[in-house]
Regions:
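Hydrophobic transmembrane alpha-helices and immediately adjacent juxtamembrane helices
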Residues: 1-248
């Protein structure tokens, strides 16, 4: 199903799966132009390098896009696969996993672009980059929990997809994607850390770019929260799925 999802995404386009690599490449070029050239932005605590700023922003976007793609597609997920709803033996709960699998494969393509540019302009990433899968584990569980919840609610409230789109756009600017957390006044930093994505993005930048290992306590706290969200989302999905066939 993940393969079908991947192929279906670019069905009819001339370059097909090549867009998995071209999209992040174009995105990296655009953000480099806008923030580093036009607005002359520099990363606080970093060097004056434009390529460094672009790579740091791109790493944050990589994390954010995993979450945003999952949750934006979740509200219409069941309706788009209505043929599976009346199949008693089909496990509907795997549909968000299929979306996540497709999104993660695209994220791997984006990561490969990031790695190539890092090698060209900065050099080898630090050894802590090997910790990236661990840094992303809370993100995966958190995304799944929210996706299960939105997939179930989206069957009954079709307008929720419009709300989610606006919410994720706003969330982009309060998730430390375009700036480090320590760039904010100290009074506002605790508020930003209430957003789980902000901490995950900082951890990913730390292991990929700065050579900073994940703090065990921060990671454990993130995992506990992510597991709680995943459990809650799954429970809501299982309770609400009983009425899917009647609504669809």
């Amino acid at each position: 199903m993940i393969k079908r999802e991947m192929l279906g995404r670019y069905r009819g386009s001339m370059m097909g799966l090549l867009w998995s690599f071209l999209n992040p490449l174009l995105m990296l070029a655009v953000y480099t132009l806008v923030f580093s050239v036009m607005f002359k932005q520099k990363w606080q605590g970093g060097s004056e390098s434009r390529s460094e700023f672009a790579l740091l922003v791109f790493a944050g976007l990589l994390v954010f896009n995993i979450f945003s793609e999952c949750v934006q597609r979740a509200p219409t997920l069941i309706a788009a696969n209505a043929n599976y709803v009346k199949k008693v033996i089909f496990p509907l709960e795997i549909l968000p996993w299929v979306t996540l699998g497709s999104v993660l494969l695209h994220a791997m393509a984006s990561l490969s672009i990031w790695l190539v540019f890092h090698l060209l302009f900065i050099g080898l990433p630090p050894l802590t980059a090997l910790l990236l899968p661990f840094a992303l584990m809370p993100l995966v569980l958190f995304s799944m929990g929210v996706s299960w919840l939105l997939a179930a609610v989206g069957v009954y409230l079709r307008d929720i997809s419009q709300v989610v789109g606006a919410f994720t756009t706003a969330l982009l600017f309060v998730s430390a994607v375009f700036y480090p957390i320590n760039a904010l006044p100290e009074a506002y930093r605790p508020l930003l850390l209430l957003n789980p994505l902000a901490l995950i993005i900082e951890q990913v930048r730390g292991v990929l770019f700065w050579g900073v290992p994940i703090k065990p306590l921060d990671w454990a706290a993130g995992m506990v929260l992510a597991c709680a969200v995943a459990w809650l989302g799954f429970r809501c999905f299982q309770r609400m799925r009983k009425g899917f066939a009647d609504v669809l």
